[in-house]
Amino acid sequence: MVDENDGKGLESRPPTISDLVTLCSALNAEGAIYVVIGGMAMIQAGFVRATVDIDLLIEMSKENQERVRRALMSLPDQAVREMHPDDIERYTVVRIADEFVIDLMGRACGMDFAQAMDGIEQVSIDGVLIPFANPGLMWKPKQTGRDKDDLDRMFLRERLNKK
């Protein structure tokens, strides 16, 4: 147990594929509507790279936000308790820093879940069906000025040109 006054807090670690499977299993059990985007989707598409979080684009109904919240309560630190009910509507990204970090988004580069639906590929990992953004869907969110997005764009361009 961490003493609240010792200046040392809990630290998150980079997520593993096993973490993703555990998270998605909990989300699926709650009936949450979401898609995995970002680094984990890039890894699933075949680009070997590290990621510091799991990015989720979620459907924004109040009911779905509650399903996501309940699923995140299954994580060890239950860090989602610090999230306010309207945070996903108020902020571009809501970072849940539990044992590993989950970034929740209602929109990614102007795109909401309804607009993303056609670009979702369901992939089974360890018996858990996980909705990943396909390379075509990942293209738009990667149009940023970040260095790591430059590398992702080069990979996606190659993947999309091969199709």
Task: Please place each PLM-identified region on the residue numbering.
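Compositionally biased terminal segments of proteins
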Residues: M1-K163
